[in-house]
Amino acid sequence: VYAPNRHVYFATLPGMWERTISCSSLSKTYSITGWRLGYIIAPSNIIEVAKKVHDFLTVGAAAPLQEAAVTGLRFGDEYYDDLREKYTAKRDLFIKGLNDIGIKHTVPQGAYYVMLDISEFGFESDLEFCDVLARDVGVGAVPGSSFFREPVNSLIRLHFAKKDETLYEALNRLSDIRKKIAKR
């Protein structure tokens, strides 16, 4: 979570521990997205039921992956402080570039992606817009509709946890977006 915001674990609120299942993943925090390792924190009676369900849905992660995960879980606060500092700098770099281009967007308060508002281009489909963006501008994006239950076709998601050079190149390409993608 970026300053000045502060994360509050729901289970720490009064009366919520016994009624909360916290699900999380190691994938993004430790840059191991392909491993698909996660965990839950819950009262013991819920953990017992979850273990039974888990046995029927999946097999355990390979031992080397589990050992690597334990290493990550033992990192001290400095790891997370450094990660937050790096992501804050990348967010600020990318947001400034988008502001300079004049594209409407969200300002993430804890994520490492930005949602761009593409409504000015008049596309009926965010998926089609993403195809055109990749083909004509050279920037990959994920359709925003992938993340909403409601029909939302005016948002796309761009990821900024990349090398600064990659972000500058993406911003350079996006600076020509209005020339390369005609309004409909």
Q: Regions from the language model: what does each represent?
A:
Residues V1-R184:
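PLP-dependent class I/II
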